[in-house]
């Protein structure tokens, strides 16, 4: 599987009520991969697909560019829900705050599946109960190992 296939697998699982825009902007650097919208608001997601290292202490290289970091940070400062989703095989790690030095152990401890990711995207855009969990979390939530 690659990033394109991973994103496609998530999109297939989304509720039909979610508006999906797969962003492909060759002229503006740093723009995330997707925007999701619904009556409760919008959500930006930058996807990174990796081969998960075997050693638990290995730091994961996401390949996030400085422009992508800047874009995500700016949107989060303006209180727009923006996630970094790191996918590996059939699992993913959802980060609502940028985090440096993510280890394989951290990934494995905090991973979820793509069904849950699709449900959370739906919840945020449609205004369901899980919306506050990932859009208003304190920064420490994703910064501790």
Question: Regions from the language model: what does each represent?
Answer:
Residues 1-25:
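Acidic-basic catalytic patches of nuclease active cores, encompassing PD-(D/E)XK
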Residues 13, 101-102:
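Structured catalytic cores of enzymes that bind and process phosphorylated ligands/cofactors
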Residues 23, 44-47, 85:
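Short, conserved beta-strand edge motifs with alternating hydrophobic and charged residues
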Residues 30:
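Beta-rich catalytic cores
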Residues 34-36, 41-53:
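Conserved catalytic cores of phosphodiester-cleaving nucleases, focusing on short active-site segments
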Residues 51-71, 75:
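Mg2+/Mn2+-dependent nuclease catalytic core
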Residues 73-100:
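Nucleic-acid nuclease catalytic cores
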Residues 107-145:
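Charged phosphate-binding loop/patch that engages nucleotide di/tri-phosphates or the phosphate backbone
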């Amino acid at each position: 599987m690659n990033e394109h296939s991973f994103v496609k697998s998530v999109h297939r699982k989304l509720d039909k009520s979610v508006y999906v825009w797969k962003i492909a902007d060759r002229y503006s650097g740093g723009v995330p991969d997707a925007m999701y919208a619904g009556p409760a608001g919008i959500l930006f997601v930058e996807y990174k697909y990796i081969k998960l290292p075997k050693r638990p202490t290995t730091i994961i290289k996401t390949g996030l560019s400085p422009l992508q970091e800047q874009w995500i940070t700016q949107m989060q400062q303006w209180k727009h829900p923006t996630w970094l989703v790191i996918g590996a095989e059939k699992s993913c790690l959802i980060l609502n705050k940028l985090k440096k030095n993510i280890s394989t152990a951290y990934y494995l401890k905090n991973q979820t599946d793509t069904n849950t990711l699709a449900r959370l995207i739906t919840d945020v855009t449609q205004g369901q109960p899980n919306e506050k969990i990932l859009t208003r979390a304190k920064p420490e939530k994703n910064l501790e190992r």
